[in-house]
Amino acid sequence: MDTSKGEGKRVIKLPGSQEQGEEEDDIGEDSKKTRALTPSGKRASGSTQRSCQVENCAAEMTNAKPYHRRHKVCEFHAKAPVVLHSGLQQRFCQQCSRFHELSEFDEAKRSCRRRLAGHNERRRKSSHDTH
């Protein structure tokens, strides 16, 4: 892969193909944002879901915070204790950024037990190392 640091572009040579594709870095409001070009030079189009993924929710996501747009969940359902998702009663996990069944949460917590256990383990290790 040839890289040109001055231009911020990478040229990708595909095996068995004469065409070349380019990736260009798009540095705007979010420096992590990148856009890819297809071998024909056109921008790749992704599926854009403009509403919350919870059943029967028509919340418009175009003006939502970037976090909620990225995870396709409106602010109300991200914080709701129970939502109907995929026909099941679930809750949005703040650590995983996914919906889990209610049985995976302790009481009213917003993070699933598995992720909380990992978080607590890391906390115990770091506090143990400092003593």
UniProtKB/Swiss-Prot annotation:
Name the predominant localization. Answer: nucleus
**Cell compartments where the protein resides:** Nucleus
Q: SUPFAM superfamilies per the record? A: SBT domain
Which amino acid positions bind Zn(2+) 1, per UniProt? C52, C57, C74, H77
Residues spanned by motif Bipartite nuclear localization signal: 109-125
Any GO MF annotation of the entry: DNA-binding transcription factor activity
Zinc-finger keyword on record:
yes
Can you name a GO cellular component term? Answer: nucleus
User: Where are zinc fingers of the kind SBP-type found along the chain?
Assistant: 49-126
Q: Where is this region: Disordered?
A: 1-52
Which residue stretches does the UniProt record annotate as biased composition, category Basic and acidic residues?
1-10
> Which keywords describe this protein according to UniProt?
DNA-binding, Metal-binding, Nucleus, Transcription, Transcription regulation, Zinc, Zinc-finger
Q: Can you tell which superkingdom this protein's organism belongs to?
A: Eukaryota
What are the recorded Gene Ontology BP terms? Answer: flower development
Annotated positions binding Zn(2+) 2: C93, C96, H100, C112
Q: What is known of its domains?
A: The SBP-type zinc finger is required for the binding to DNA.
The free-text function statement in the UniProt record for this protein reads: Probable transcriptional factor. Binds to the promoter of the SQUAMOSA gene.
Q: What is the name of the protein in this document?
A: Squamosa promoter-binding protein 1
Origin species, per record, is Antirrhinum majus
Identify the gene encoding this protein.
SBP1
